[in-house]
């Protein structure tokens, strides 16, 4: 939701929802964890009186740092109530509050994420066609249309926020998260940064936007569904946001010549950089390619599905390498990072909260915005518990600075170059990825292809070093922390 973290709001006597406190465990049996974020976690739960299964999103009060954040929670609940019952939108059940948390109980969607459904077709060798893509985007744009009609701008449309109601072939796609959503105020120009990389609209980056930004995000999803990758690249650092604002998308490259011209026309209309000229949700649903039965059921080349799989596996090898480097830093090298961690962790809890990170960075001379610090927090918080521990801190700071030292990168290269022949081969890369439970053959081939500038089918040290020093634009630009030598 963008504004959770800190210990400032301890268990308050007044209630956030302005109704009596309730022990949720007397109403529901809380079960397995479904997901975790900076604000808390979502669990499967069973209603004791009926035996029905729901999902329970628990927001810890200690993560709400001010009244603005409390208002964000109340707004999310109001929006879910207002939209409940609309097609393709998760059903709101109820909201409760106890002394520690706010609990939002909603419909349980047991079919997994949207991309998982598509990739399952790839895994079992089934076909995937424009017809499937049109059906998926129809559900997504139907959400946008209903949100806008009901006076809500979603602001964070991405595949991860869409789940399937079941594992059945005819399962319904539903949007589940309204943490970034706002009520649309007539004539208001929105300026705050909201959304996710890849899917964020250019006008959002420019700080001047309205509900049309949701159509752009849906258009990016459609683009990816039809070609298997994003139109924008994250590397080198900062390039993606610049491309979102200005890059002319090339539809002459494969596989676009194989796509229906009407599909391409729709993507172009949804990705018009002028929000005033961009197609509306109702117009998308009425587009010739989108009409029921119009999109081709001819199987799309398997390369698109394999690209989708690689798109999800992006940067996994880098994470494997970073984990190795962090684990092998000497005590002397870690000493400086530990000192910095201790200075920022002012309450000496062993964990850095968002508020401590903001205060610490300001004290160190950083002028990052609130959103940029939140992005940094999210990137460093690997286990998603809302705080940064010492290991996460070392990995995050080492990621940006220790990679400038050849000895660290070379030591990692040697670790993955099992036969010490000066190259990381496909087999060696496969071994490294499988040890970490990441990557398939297509992803591994793509990692090599992306890094292998001399096209010999292997990764030498120079290529490895270049790959590891190429940053992701997920991190805010500029120096975040002082360099530790």
Curated annotation (Swiss-Prot):
Residues bound to Ca(2+) 3: 417, 419, 421, 423, 428
EC annotation from Swiss-Prot or TrEMBL: 2.7.11.1
Modified residues (Phosphoserine): 196
Domain EF-hand: 332-367, 368-403, 404-439, 444-474
List of catalytic residues: 156
Residues of the Protein kinase domain: 28-290
Swiss-Prot/TrEMBL domain comment: There are 3 contiguous domains conserved in the CDPK subfamily: a kinase domain, an autoinhibitory (junction) domain and a calmodulin-like domain. The autoinhibitory domain (295-325) inactivates kinase activity under calcium-free conditions.
Role description: May play a role in signal transduction pathways that involve calcium as a second messenger.
Regulation: Activated by calcium. Autophosphorylation may play an important role in the regulation of the kinase activity.
Cellular compartments annotated: Membrane
Catalyzed chemical reaction(s): L-seryl-[protein] + ATP = O-phospho-L-seryl-[protein] + ADP + H(+); L-threonyl-[protein] + ATP = O-phospho-L-threonyl-[protein] + ADP + H(+)
Principal localisation: membrane
InterPro entries cross-referenced by the UniProt entry: CDPK_Ser/Thr_kinases, EF-hand-dom_pair, EF_Hand_1_Ca_BS, EF_hand_dom, Kinase-like_dom_sf, Prot_kinase_dom, Protein_kinase_ATP_BS, Ser/Thr_kinase_AS
Chain positions recorded as ATP binding sites: 34-42, 57
Protein name per its UniProtKB record: Calcium-dependent protein kinase 27
Binding-site residues for Ca(2+) 2, renumbered to this chain: 381, 383, 385, 387, 392
UniProt membrane topology term: Lipid-anchor
Lipidation (N-myristoyl glycine): 2
Tagged with keyword Kinase: yes
Keywords, in A-Z order: ATP-binding, Calcium, Kinase, Lipoprotein, Membrane, Metal-binding, Myristate, Nucleotide-binding, Phosphoprotein, Repeat, Serine/threonine-protein kinase, Transferase
Region described as Autoinhibitory domain: spans on this chain: 295-325
């Amino acid at each position: 939701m963008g504004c959770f973290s800190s210990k400032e709001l301890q268990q308050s006597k007044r209630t956030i929802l302005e109704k009596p406190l309730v022990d949720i465990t007397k109403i529901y049996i809380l079960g397995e964890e479904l997901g975790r974020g900076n604000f808390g976690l979502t669990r499967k739960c069973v209603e004791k009186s009926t035996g029905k299964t729901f999902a329970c999103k628990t927001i810890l009060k200690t993560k709400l740092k001010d009244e603005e954040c409390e208002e964000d929670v109340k707004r999310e609940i109001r929006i879910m109530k207002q939209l409940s019952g609309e097609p393709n939108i998760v059903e709101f059940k109820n909201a409760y509050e106890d002394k520690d948390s706010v609990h939002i109980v909603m419909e349980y969607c047991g079919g997994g994420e949207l991309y998982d459904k598509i990739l399952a077709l790839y895994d079992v060798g089934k076909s995937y066609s424009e017809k499937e893509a049109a059906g998926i985007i129809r559900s997504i744009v139907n959400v946008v249309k209903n949100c806008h009609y009901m006076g809500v701008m979603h602001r964070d449309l991405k595949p991860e926020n869409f789940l399937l109601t079941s594992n059945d072939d005819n399962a319904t796609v539903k949007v589940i998260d309204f943490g970034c959503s706002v009520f649309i105020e007539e004539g208001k120009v929105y300026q705050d940064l909201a959304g996710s990389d890849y899917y964020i609209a250019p006008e959002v980056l420019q700080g001047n936007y309205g509900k049309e930004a949701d159509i752009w995000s849906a258009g990016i999803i459609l683009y990816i569904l039809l070609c298997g990758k994003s139109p924008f690249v994250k590397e080198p650092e900062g390039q993606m946001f610049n491309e979102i604002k200005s890059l002319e998308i090339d539809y002459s490259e494969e596989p676009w010549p194989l796509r229906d011209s009407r599909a391409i026309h729709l993507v172009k209309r949804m990705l018009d950089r002028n929000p005033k000229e961009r197609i509306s949700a109702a117009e998308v649903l009425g587009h010739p390619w989108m009409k029921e039965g119009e999109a081709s059921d001819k199987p799309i080349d398997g390369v698109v599905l394999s690209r989708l799989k690689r798109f999800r596996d992006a940067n996994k090898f880098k994470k494997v390498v970073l984990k190795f480097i962090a684990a092998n830093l000497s005590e002397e090298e870690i000493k400086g990072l530990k000192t910095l961690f201790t200075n920022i962790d002012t309450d000496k809890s062993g964990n850095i909260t968002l508020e401590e990170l903001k205060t610490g960075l300001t004290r160190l001379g950083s002028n990052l915005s609130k959103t940029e610090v939140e992005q940094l927090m999210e990137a460093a918080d690997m286990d998603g518990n809302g705080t940064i521990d010492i290991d996460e801190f070392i990995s995050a700071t080492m990621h940006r600075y220790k990679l400038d030292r050849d000895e660290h990168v070379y030591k990692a290269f040697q670790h993955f170059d099992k036969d010490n022949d000066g190259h990381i081969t496909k087999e060696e890369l496969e071994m490294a990825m499988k040890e970490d439970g990441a990557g398939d053959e297509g992803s591994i081939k793509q990692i090599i292809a992306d890094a292998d500038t001399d096209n010999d089918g292997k990764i030498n040290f120079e290529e490895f070093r270049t790959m590891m020093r190429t940053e992701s634009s997920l991190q805010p630009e500029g120096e975040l922390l002082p360099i530790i030598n």
